[in-house]
Each structure stands twice: as structure tokens, then as C-alpha cells.
């Protein structure tokens, strides 16, 4: 008899964003005339940069000619894209990262889950609370946890609270942890990390033989020159960190799909016999076996991000969304609400008014304002009483949503 992976049965209810979609769909069906503004899931709204579109159109035409047609590409990504990423995103910031340490993929969400394939089942794992749900759920699916308690916390995971009291940056744990998930600029709180903060984590990881999974999906939104964009700006990070990045939010690739994972050649972890094993070799083997690479057409679009025209167009996209974040932050702050994030990040983290729970505020916002956000409790127990609003929408929708919220929830 066939059996299932019973770890899936441990997962709490539905994944956060499908549950949001279910509630919104039910409301929309009952209220077909409602003009719903979605500031929930972090999906972009503005068109792809012209440079990327033109590059992909050219690539499509190449696929129509036998002499320039491309079939299977390298599982790791084409060298011309990896080289541009290495030069522009890392070496330009003083990071010692080479092209062959960069693996192109179809999304950071996939990579942050798939990376667990190359690690053992007996690692201790730390996540912040609140946290991007994928980090937790993929560990549950892989059998790295026990059951969840009433607060949604899984046995076997080490939760590091991030709160207003610690500026939404986790404290270094007292105990030894093997795998550590960090995300800066942070999803969902919009918090950022200083070089000093990341240096403390790198020092901890090196002292304890830990590996940091560093999610830098929102690094393009950093405007403060003093803040690091990459964990590899910190001395010693090549010996303890894997970094994930994406073209989704800076270049609008949410529907086009292109991302990257950096695994330094110098990064190792222990085998069962105590010997050091190069993680680059394991990840390369994993990708070569389970992944056929990103479309040639999409990679040409991603390459165009690094052209002078592409750089200018991406910068304008990022500025547009950051201005949306500023509008959300300033409008809600002026109305008397407690607001965090929205600076150097596209997410605004709002304290729910009137003592409402996160999901109660979600429902009230949907039903009274026809605005969709994301309940903070969906990101973890420490997110209860908070709410995430995304800057990824049109200017008109953001401004209209703020007017609706302020009129119904004045401080």
C-alpha cells in the first residue's frame, strides 16, 4: 500500500497566502461590486522594464532560427548572466564572490526550501518570529519538527522573537544552533540590519560551526549607504553563509521567474564521520539532478537588468514602490497608528488598532474598507497584534487604500 509523507499532516491549516485568497474570494463572491485593493501578498503591479522586455523579445526571435536556437541550458545558469551578477551585485560591493558560486533558479521561495535537501535531519534550526512562512513550513515537510502547539510554534524549532523592543532584529541565541534563517530587509517587518548586527551573527556562526541562510530578496530597496546589501560584505561570511536573491521585486519578475543562490566554494559542513564536505558540490549535484535550469529567454531578460538602461529602469521601479511605502507609513503614522518598516524596505508593519487580533483586523479591513493586507499572526506567534501592508501596488490604489483605512480606523 502506498503511504504519504505524514509530515505534511503537521502543517497548520492552509499556507498563509492561500488562506488570505480564500477569504478574499468568498467576500468578492458575496460582494461583486466591491472595489478590493490588495496590499497583501507581495506581488508587483508595474510592467517589466523595457530593457528586459526587449531582451526577451530578441531571445524569442533567436529561438525561431535554427542557427541561434537554444535547447537545454546549464542547470547552474548561463555563464554570461552569472558573470554579470557576480560583478554588479557582489564584487562592486567588495564581496569576494565569483560567477561559478552563483546558481540561477526560478525563485528564491523554491531555493530556500530546496536547500534543505543537502543538509541532514539532525540539525538544530533557528527562525525569527515573525518569519516568512516558507522557512518554517519546508522544515515541517522535511520532517525536521514535531507537532505545533496552540500558538503555532513547532516542536524542534528555535524561535527568535523580533519585536519593537529589539527593533525587530533577533538577538544571538544563547544555545548552539546549526542552521539559522535571516532575512534583511526583513519580511514581514521591514526591519534592516546594520553591519554590526550581521557581524555578530557571522562571528556566532563561525564559532559554532553554523550555517546562515541569508535571504536578501529585498536588498535593492536599501537606500541607506551604511547598510549592507549582502551577508558577504561581512568578513568571514564566505565560511558560514548561503545567500538567496531574486529578480522578482526589483525588476518585476514575479510572473517571469528568475532568482539566484550563492554558495561559496569555501563553505563546508560536517559529514557523519566528522569530515568536512564542500556544500557547493552538494548543491551543484542537487541542481544537476532535480533542476533543468531557467529558460534561456528569461535569463536574457535578467541579463538586461545589468545594462545601463536596465539599471536606470530598475532604479525607477524601486523608487516607485519605496514612495508607496513612504505614503503608507506617513499616512498611518499621521492618523495615530503605530507603524514600523517602510524605510529601506517595501513592507510596512502596523500595530493593529483597538486591540484587534491580526485576523480580526484583516476581516474588518476587508469588510469595511475593501482593503487586503496580511495578518501578522500568519508569520508567527510574535506577529499577533500586527499587520503587514505591501507597497507593491499602483500609486492610485495605495492612496485610495490609505484614505479608506484612515476613515475607518482613526488612531
UniProtKB/Swiss-Prot annotation:
Pyridoxal 5'-phosphate binds at residues 72, 108-109, 132, 187, 218, 246-248, 257, 292. Substrate binds at residues 15, 42, 109, 132, 187, 292, 388. The modification N6-(pyridoxal phosphate)lysine is found at residue 249. The keyword Transferase applies. One of its GO terms (biological process) is lysine biosynthetic process via diaminopimelate, diaminopimelate-aminotransferase pathway. Keywords: Aminotransferase, Pyridoxal phosphate, Transferase. It holds the Pfam family Aminotran_1_2. GO terms for molecular function: L,L-diaminopimelate aminotransferase activity; pyridoxal phosphate binding. It comes from the Bacteria. Its EC number is 2.6.1.83. It catalyses: (2S,6S)-2,6-diaminopimelate + 2-oxoglutarate = (S)-2,3,4,5-tetrahydrodipicolinate + L-glutamate + H2O + H(+). Pathway: Amino-acid biosynthesis; L-lysine biosynthesis via DAP pathway; LL-2,6-diaminopimelate from (S)-tetrahydrodipicolinate (aminotransferase route): step 1/1. Homodimer. Belongs to the class-I pyridoxal-phosphate-dependent aminotransferase family. LL-diaminopimelate aminotransferase subfamily. Involved in the synthesis of meso-diaminopimelate (m-DAP or DL-DAP), required for both lysine and peptidoglycan biosynthesis. Catalyzes the direct conversion of tetrahydrodipicolinate to LL-diaminopimelate. This is LL-diaminopimelate aminotransferase.
